[in-house]
UniProtKB/Swiss-Prot annotation:
GO MF entry, a single one: metal ion binding
Free-text function comment from the UniProt entry: Self-glucosylating initiator of glycogen synthesis. It catalyzes the formation of a short alpha (1,4)-glucosyl chain covalently attached via a glucose 1-O-tyrosyl linkage to internal tyrosine residues and these chains act as primers for the elongation reaction catalyzed by glycogen synthase. Capable of transferring glucosyl residues to unbound acceptors such as free oligoglucans or oligoglucan derivatives.
Binding-site residues, UDP: L10, Y16, R95, D120, D122, H247, G250, K253
Record protein name field: Glycogenin-1
Signal peptide: none
Gene disruption: observed consequences: Simultaneous knockout of GLG2 abolishes glycogen biosynthesis.
InterPro entries: Glyco_trans_8, GNT1/Glycosyltrans_8, Nucleotide-diphossugar_trans
Length: 616
């Protein structure tokens, strides 16, 4: 085993500063746990312009307390040309910031160390077992690189975790190779594979004599976790006890603002947050620094200057800085108000509860054309919806079996004919005075029937113009109604659907909702449907007794009994026929509403405060 060992990481953008803090804190903790705190150094490689021009004094002091050695480096001499050359391949990754990762070639210049374990700043060692890599690669040569297969293409290695031997000659050859060749992915991983990985050699003759070698290590030393939640669950469960290190690949990191809101949380994401909270407690930053809000937007960063940068006259951040993640207490007051500091018990912050429960309830409903509707229009939608329901019920009533209604009409017409003939005979026997009285009683009784029909129409919910009665039903004689109460009830039921809009007040429209009809009935306290037949039947019978003598009444009662028996038999036949007829199936509302525009309006039926009780 080599004597001078180091664990190094790279900081080329302030966006990765939280990852550098958490990684350095965790590595020091595990080194102390393994008893190798003095045997293995921690090293941070950072660009000179970033360290002197962007980071604050507080950030610099913290970095110097975490890492035993900080190495300032300049961009590669060929970096501008390499960025332009690799721009097309880099665009495929949609990761423009990776163009600066070519500075990772500077790792082989760390000749002050004999062996280096490189870790990306978005990695998190889980336990001290990751230090076994030094034992596994104890006989490594300068032409070898120890790395783990990439999850995207296993014939290539992931450059986030690498074991390497610093060497000046290798560093020089590598930098020239970067200048002369185009990276597969436009970034450091592609070009390092082309340089060290024998699998990337397309020429079979050259492949056999390839001078450099990739030593493949176990995947448990670099378990890549994409932030979209994709992973091989069975393998993760099986090898979970053996995992030594987690790598948060992708553009969204655990500390980024997008991840804090949208990331599919898992135990490793929570573990990173716990480590970061421990780091803040150790450095007493809970009252000074809130959780950093790193923007996830893809920014086209300008290449850093190649010329060496002298020490600036002051350490204040420049005006062209990308982001000042950690600053003084006064600069972070707004950050504290913007996002609360997590609890000191290291428990992960709970997911925010959506306050707009109406939007949450109708997540699968297309509401685009209703989002900008005013409140009064939403009420109109509610009324239209109620009218649609009323119209549908009236249509169903109208579509009732026509045979039954026709047969009833025919039977009632026969009864009317018989009653008219009896009336004609009685009229010849009576004198003119009796005829006049009879006519006056007839008119009064027709008024009663008209009043009852109008009252029943107020109770019904049928729309205008839906008159189901024919001319024969409207011409029913006076004698047929009082002589047979059951016949009168049936006649009233047939006349009931007819609507008389003249009885409604002027301020009530015919096409109103059910609530308006109920309010109107409350104003008119008389005329309930179930009591109407008894009222006008009793009055009609009293009037009849005044105008008919005993002989005429006996004859009429005989005819009435005969007609009543015939009517009962006819009703029994109708009931049997209705029983034999197939019952009309009601529409399946569970599926019919999918074809209508009901869903576009249903959200407006919910009051805005319906879910307020659930919000604390």
């Amino acid at each position: 085993m080599y004597k001078k060992l180091a664990i190094a990481t790279l900081l080329y953008s302030a966006d990765y500063l939280p990852g550098v803090f958490a990684l350095g804190h965790q590595v020091n903790k595990l080194l102390e746990e393994a008893g190798k705190k003095g045997d293995i150094e921690t090293c941070l490689i950072v660009t000179t312009s970033l360290f002197n021009g962007t980071l604050s004094e507080l950030a610099k002091n913290i970095l110097q307390s975490i890492y035993t050695k900080i190495v300032l480096v300049e961009p590669l001499n060929c970096q501008e040309e390499s960025i332009q050359k690799n721009s097309e391949n880099l665009a495929l990754l949609e990761r423009p910031e990776l163009s600066f990762a070519l500075i990772k070639a500077r790792l082989w210049e760390l000749t002050q160390f004999e062996q280096v374990l490189y870790l990306d700043s978005d990695t998190l060692p889980l336990n001290k077992e990751f230090l076994k890599l030094f034992d596994i690669m104890s006989k490594q040569t300068t032409s070898q690189v120890g790395a783990i297969a990439d999850i995207g293409w296993p014939d290539m290695f992931n450059s986030g975790v690498m074991m390497l031997i610093p060497d000046a000659d290798t560093a020089s050859v590598l930098q020239n190779y970067i200048f002369e060749n185009t990276s597969i992915d436009g970034s450091d991983q592609g070009i390092l594979n082309q340089f060290f990985n024998q699998n990337c050699c397309t020429d079979e003759l050259v492949k056999d004599s390839f001078s450099r070698e990739w030593v493949q290590l176990s995947f448990t030393y670099n378990v890549t976790i994409p932030n979209l939640g994709y992973q091989s669950s069975p393998a993760m469960n099986y090898f979970k006890p053996s995992i030594k290190l987690i790598h948060f690949i992708g553009k969204h990191k655990p500390w980024s603002l997008w991840s804090q809101k949208n990331f599919i949380k898992n135990e490793y994401h929570d573990q990173w947050n716990e480590v970061y909270e421990e780091f803040k407690e150790e450095h007493q930053l809970n009252n000074e620094v809130s959780k950093p809000k790193i923007s996830d937007s893809d920014k086209t960063e300008t290449p850093e200057t190649i010329t060496p940068v002298d020490a600036p006259p002051s350490n204040e951040p420049t005006t062209n800085q990308e982001i000042d993640t950690i600053s003084t207490v006064e600069e972070n007051v707004d950050n504290q108000n913007a996002e609360p500091v997590p609890n000191s018990d290291h428990s992960p912050a709970p997911n925010p509860v959506p306050l707009d429960f109406t939007k949450w309830l109708t997540t699968f409903i297309n509401k685009d054309h209703l989002t900008n509707q005013p409140v009064n229009e939403s009420r109109e939608y509610s009324k239209e919806n109620d009218n649609n329901i009323i119209n549908s019920s009236s249509n169903r009533d109208q579509e009732s079996p026509p045979n039954s209604t026709q047969e009833l009409n025919s039977s009632y017409s026969v009864v009317s004919t018989q009653a008219d003939s009896d009336e004609h005979q009685n009229a010849e026997e009576e004198d003119s005075t009796t005829d006049n009285a009879s006519n006056s009683g007839e008119e009064s009784h027709l008024d009663d029937i008209s009043t009852a029909a109008s009252s029943n129409n107020n109770v019904s919910n049928q729309p205008d113009g839906k008159n189901f009665s024919n001319s024969k039903e409207n011409n029913i004689s006076v004698e047929s109604s009082p002589s047979n109460p059951e016949q009168k009830r049936s006649t009233d039921n047939i006349q009931k659907p007819s609507v008389s809009t003249n009885d409604l007040p002027d301020d009530v429209e015919p096409h109103t909702s059910v609530d308006d009809n109920i309010q109107y009935l409350e104003k008119d306290k008389e005329g309930y449907e179930e009591f109407l037949p008894d009222v006008y039947e009793s009055n009609a019978i009293d009037n009849e007794e005044e105008f008919f003598d005993d002989d005429a009444r006996d004859a009429t009662e005989g005819e009435t009994k005969t007609s009543a028996v015939a009517d009962k038999q006819e009703d029994m036949k109708l009931t049997a026929e209705e029983t034999n007829q197939p019952q009309q199936e009601m529409p399946n509302f569970k599926f019919d509403w999918e074809d209508s525009d009901y869903l576009s309006k249903v959200e407006r039926c919910f009051p805005d405060d319906i879910f307020e009780y659930a919000v604390e």
